[in-house]
C-alpha cells in the first residue's frame, strides 16, 4: 500500500503573502543520479524561498567558494541552482554549513544557513515500465531505496510535463522490498503518442517534519505510448 503525504519544501507554510519583516529560508541537499556508465554521481542542490521579494541570492560553501543562485521567476520569491551534467561528480558534496546571503527588494541583506550531512540516497533501480495486457494502464516497478522517507514521480513527453505525483510513502508493514505504481494511459497521454519519460525520485528529509531535504536521488526510464 502506498500512502500519499503532503510535502512542504523549505519549511515555510502558509496560504497567503503577509506584509512582514523580510524573512527567507535556505536548504541544501545532495542529489544523486546514474551517469552514462552506470556510476552514481552527486551534486549539491540549493533552494531559497521567501514570501518577500528577493533580488539576489548567493551561497558560500564550507570550502569558502561563492555561487550565485538563479531566480525561478520575476516575482523573486524563489532562487535555486540548476546543475549541469558536468556538475555531477563521483563523490558527494562537502558536508557542513552552507551560508546564504539574501538581498531583498528594499535593499536589506540577511544571511541564513543550512547544514549538509554526509547522508545520501542511491538512485532507485526501476525494474520494469510496461503497459498492461489490455493497453489501458502503465505500470512502473522499482526496488525500494534503503533509508528513503518518500518518493515522487514526474512524467514528461519531451519537454512537456504531463503528470506529477507529490511525495508518497510505502505504508506496508513490514516495508516492501519492491514497489509498483499503476497509472491510466489515457490520463497520461490524452491520445498523444510518443516517448514518455518516467522520473522517479527518492526523498530523504532532515527530520520528521518533512520540511527540509537532506538528500534525493533520481532514476529515469522511457516508454513509448
Regions found by a protein language model. Give the residues of each.
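Bacterial Sec-dependent N-terminal signal peptides
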Residues: 7-37, 225
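Proline-enriched interdomain boundary motifs that mark the N-terminal boundary
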Residues: 24-27, 120-130
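Short, solvent-exposed loop/linker segments at the N-terminal edge
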Residues: 32-38, 130-136
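Post-signal-peptide N-terminal segment of Sec-exported extracytoplasmic proteins
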Residues: 34-68
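Conserved aromatic anchor
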Residues: 46-48, 136-148
Amino acid at each position: 500500500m502506498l500512502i500519499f503525504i503532503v510535502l512542504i519544501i523549505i519549511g515555510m507554510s502558509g496560504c497567503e503573502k503577509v506584509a512582514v519583516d523580510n524573512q527567507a529560508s535556505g536548504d541544501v541537499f545532495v542529489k544523486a543520479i546514474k551517469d552514462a556508465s552506470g556510476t552514481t554521481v552527486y551534486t549539491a542542490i540549493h533552494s531559497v524561498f521567501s514570501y518577500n521579494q528577493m533580488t539576489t541570492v548567493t551561497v558560500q560553501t564550507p570550502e569558502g567558494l561563492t555561487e550565485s543562485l538563479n531566480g525561478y521567476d520575476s516575482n523573486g520569491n524563489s532562487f535555486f541552482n540548476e546543475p549541469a551534467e558536468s556538475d555531477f561528480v563521483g563523490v558527494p558534496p562537502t558536508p557542513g554549513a552552507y551560508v546564504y546571503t539574501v538581498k531583498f527588494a528594499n535593499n536589506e541583506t540577511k544571511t541564513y544557513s543550512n547544514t549538509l550531512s554526509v547522508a545520501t540516497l542511491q538512485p532507485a533501480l526501476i525494474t520494469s515500465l510496461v503497459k498492461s495486457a489490455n493497453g489501458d494502464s502503465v505500470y512502473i516497478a522499482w526496488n525500494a531505496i534503503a533509508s528513503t522517507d518518500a518518493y515522487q514521480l514526474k512524467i514528461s513527453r519531451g519537454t512537456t510535463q504531463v503528470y506529477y505525483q507529490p511525495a508518497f510513502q510505502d505504508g506496508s508493514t513490514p516495508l516492501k522490498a519492491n514497489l509498483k505504481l499503476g497509472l491510466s494511459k489515457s490520463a497520461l497521454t490524452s491520445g498523444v503518442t510518443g516517448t514518455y519519460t518516467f522520473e522517479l525520485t527518492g526523498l530523504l528529509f532532515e527530520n520528521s517534519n518533512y520540511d527540509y531535504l537532506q538528500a534525493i536521488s533520481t532514476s529515469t526510464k522511457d516508454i513509448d505510448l
